[in-house]
């Protein structure tokens, strides 16, 4: 088996839908994707029954990340990072609304979809219509946020598409401000914490200054991800680096599936954290409801 894997190309695969754009190499996908996740069951099935509280997911609507060398990485939200945490939340009884910056369809990295994982696939099928026709985030801010909003948490999944637009959006900034001011949860993982950069947009300091976070390691995006052909070049900027410059504390430098809670900010380091982050979010949200 290892010999067969080693024969796979480490050259990124051309994406014929766009000029000079590439999917991850066959070899990198053999290392980073699998037909099943580590999902081991739902801990609180149906535990939330009142129906009021919901999750607002801010999904990526842009497919391509322009790299330093002029090539583009064909990406999107990582399906495991999006759908496995949501599986735990939805099975616990929380409804999910999907929003993108412009209201355009959410983009997923279908090449990372675990096709034999019932938890992920079933959640994808339930959300597919919302992913194709999401809400526009500005409309959500105008009509559905405020102290009496039904959203208990804001969820930003990972995938490299999170570094495009979401990290420098005034609408994301307003959403994060609302969550912080109204004691709501912010849940994100892998490259999703790029969204937290928007909190410091045009400000002397970020309201998230001093918060500790898990995030995808910059060292992998600078090294192994390029060497094995996952990325067709270097990113123009690195998530952990810029978070650190906004005085957030990045607690990991590797990818182990680590999760972290700092106040109402719940983070995970990679796709490996998806299952545990979903469990953590459910536990924290249920506890918050009991204490309201």
Swiss-Prot record:
Function: Protein and nucleotide deglycase that catalyzes the deglycation of the Maillard adducts formed between amino groups of proteins or nucleotides and reactive carbonyl groups of glyoxals. Thus, functions as a protein deglycase that repairs methylglyoxal- and glyoxal-glycated proteins, and releases repaired proteins and lactate or glycolate, respectively. Deglycates cysteine, arginine and lysine residues in proteins, and thus reactivates these proteins by reversing glycation by glyoxals.
Main location (coarse class): cytoplasm
Biased composition (Polar residues): 1-12
Family: Belongs to the peptidase C56 family. HchA subfamily.
Matching HAMAP family: Deglycase_HchA
Subcellular location: Cytoplasm
GO terms assigned for molecular function: glyoxalase III activity; protein deglycase activity; thiolester hydrolase activity
Gene: hchA
Catalytic activity: N(omega)-(1-hydroxy-2-oxopropyl)-L-arginyl-[protein] + H2O = lactate + L-arginyl-[protein] + H(+); N(6)-(1-hydroxy-2-oxopropyl)-L-lysyl-[protein] + H2O = lactate + L-lysyl-[protein] + H(+); S-(1-hydroxy-2-oxopropyl)-L-cysteinyl-[protein] + H2O = lactate + L-cysteinyl-[protein] + H(+); N(omega)-(1-hydroxy-2-oxoethyl)-L-arginyl-[protein] + H2O = L-arginyl-[protein] + glycolate + H(+)
Keywords of the record: Cytoplasm, DNA damage, DNA repair, Hydrolase, Stress response
NCBIfam families recorded: PRK04155.1
Pfam families to which the protein is assigned, alphabetical: DJ-1_PfpI (PF01965)
Protein name, per record: Protein/nucleic acid deglycase HchA
E.C. number(s) listed in UniProt: 3.1.2.-, 3.5.1.-, 3.5.1.124
Region (Disordered): 1-23
The keyword DNA repair belongs to this UniProt entry's keyword annotation: yes
GO cellular component terms given for this protein: cytoplasm
Keyword DNA damage (UniProt): yes
